[in-house]
């Protein structure tokens, strides 16, 4: 409220409107071979340049704990499928990169893991990472021999790895 030289009062009102700045995130997926680790980094986008999302040691990316639905400081969580652990998720909090290490016998798609990052205002955004593990199936070649009773018969069966990136090991510790 103000008064002019003549003593006439005047009133004005100021009403600011605050618009929300909401960051966004993109879900990510990967596909890899059985027994091979997979990595992916969810992409976070600022809602406005005045509130950037800069993932760092001071503003770390975090997993959302699947049991509590809350952010956790844990950098390793079990990867689950139908209530069973099928591997492990790890996160680099300073970059947001998630690594999935499947159990050697797991094939399929585990439950996705959710990652959260916050912008400069502290507003969170979340994205999921969903890896898929494709099977690697080695093959064996049958062999047969014929001989008279009492005579020694020999033949070597042949095993072929399902993929060169997942070698088949046959030795004294892991015989055929």
Tell what function each PLM region has.
Residues 1-14, 71-129:
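Acidic, turn/loop-rich segments in luminal/extracellular domains of secretory-pathway
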Residues 55-86, 172-176:
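A surface/secretory-pathway sequence property marking extracellular, secreted
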